[in-house]
Regions:
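Bacterial N-terminal signal peptides
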Residues: 5-16
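Residues embedded in well-ordered secondary-structure elements
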Residues: 6, 99, 224-226
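Exported/periplasmic ABC-transporter solute-binding proteins
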Residues: 17-60, 64-65, 69-75, 82-85, ...
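Central helical "cap/lid" subdomain
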Residues: 95-101
Length: 269
């Protein structure tokens, strides 16, 4: 029932987005800007969509906050898939984009070095250990960083003073405008951990699992319920975009795409 409601919401919000002059096939590729955590899954979904519809799709990935800033400065994205709902909401509030809808969900996990003996029960103690290097993404630029700081606030309810300690020690290693990029063919988080830049890195569970596949010695630790933070991914379409933009947005909520998201570890909306 929830999926049906969300799909109806998306269709309603997209009503009027497509240009009345829309043509069945765009001459130029559809410009889709998407959160970096969607890189693998959205590349697969876009490839399948191209094969099915003939609409070419150009994907641009990055930290959602930085992508939103690029759009605000005039870049021509027609579909925006963010790792949160606040950045799409901000675009919608400015008037040029449709109201967003949640299309997938994620959550935070801890990616750790092999020598770190953390469990869900001891994760907070491990992160607070002064000898442990704690890595995160960059708040405001990347929702993953915002979610990490939300976790820090929850930690303060478990142990007084935890927020101040975690806020002071966290290393913002990814997601910022000047964050180093990994070499071609390497995932960001696997590379950061492989380089020893952090002992524990808070990232999306989908990223953590993918990083462990790339660097098998890394470990994935679930965040305990008291600290868990959910990530709702928001989808929006530029008002006046041609029909293929709306079609691709609809496709992301359709069962075939949702099955692909689930295969990569994402939760249903």
């Amino acid at each position: 029932m929830r999926r049906t409601t969300l799909t109806v919401t998306l269709l309603a919000s997209l009503a009027g987005c497509a240009s009345p002059e829309a043509t069945p096939v765009m001459k130029e590729p559809l410009q889709v800007y998407a959160a970096g955590s969607l890189r693998e899954v959205l590349t697969e979904i876009a490839r399948d969509h191209e094969a099915r519809t003939g609409h070419k799709i150009a994907l641009t990935f990055g930290a959602s906050g930085l992508l939103r800033e690029r759009i605000e400065k005039g870049e021509g994205a027609q579909v925006f898939a963010s790792a949160d709902t606040q950045h799409p909401q901000r675009l919608g509030a400015a008037g040029g984009w449709a109201p967003h809808t949640v299309f997938v969900r994620n959550s935070l996990c801890a990616l750790t070095q092999a020598q770190v003996n953390a469990t869900p029960q001891t994760l907070l103690e491990t992160m607070l250990n002064p000898a442990v290097k704690l890595g995160t993404s960059t708040p405001k630029a990347d929702p993953s960083g915002d979610y990490a700081w939300e976790l820090f606030r929850k930690a303060d309810a478990v142990r007084i003073g935890a927020y101040a300690a975690l806020d002071a020690k966290a290393l913002k290693l990814t997601g910022g405008p000047d964050s180093p990029k990994p070499p071609a063919g390497h995932g960001t988080y696997a590379w950061v951990m492989d380089q020893g830049q952090a002992d524990v890195f808070l990232t999306y569970c989908t990223n953590a699992v993918a990083s462990q596949k790339e660097v098998p010695r890394l470990k994935v630790v679930q965040v305990p319920a008291a600290l868990q933070v959910g990530a709702s991914y928001g989808l929006t379409v530029r008002r006046g975009a041609l029909a293929p933009a709306e079609a691709f947005a609809r496709a992301l909520l359709a069962p075939p795409a949702q099955a692909t998201f689930a295969r990569y570890g994402f939760g249903q909306p």
